[in-house]
Amino acid sequence: MIEVAEFIAREVKKGKVIEVGIGFYTRIAKRLKELGFDVLAIDINKDAVVNAKNSGLNAEVDDIFNPNISLYMGAKAIYSIRPTPEMMNYILKISKAVKVPAYIVPLTGDPVPQGMKLITYRGIPIYKWEP
């Protein structure tokens, strides 16, 4: 799954990228940071945010169903690894609001919002929306 970081690094200019719903899996965000990106990890779970901060990442608590849109301003891209189907439309809404690409790696079989383009990178399905 670390290949997702390589893919984003190839697609996105250096700058701020946001991982929505980081949970307790920080490897992709940490790899992007190593590659020179300013990574912001977002999660509604305070323990996940503390874990991300303890891993050396910038992290904030946010509810994407009622987002603090200022957190997303200035981003070059927003991505999410295996978000719930309910989260996907809200990730897309945030991306549209701040006019940046969204990348979603769904769980196998989860429906993806219409309008997203499937890209397969090293066998990993990544869905992209861009303004």
Swiss-Prot record:
| Classification via InterPro entries | SAM-dependent_MTases_sf (IPR029063), UPF0146 (IPR005353)
Alphabetical list of SUPFAM superfamilies matching this protein: S-adenosyl-L-methionine-dependent methyltransferases
Highest taxon of source: Archaea
Do you know which Gene3D superfamilies this protein is assigned to? Vaccinia Virus protein VP39 (3.40.50.150)
Pfam families assigned:
UPF0146
**Family under the similarity heading:** Belongs to the UPF0146 family.
- HAMAP family referenced in this protein's UniProt entry, alphabetically: UPF0146 (MF_00341)
Protein name per its UniProtKB record: UPF0146 protein PYRAB01940
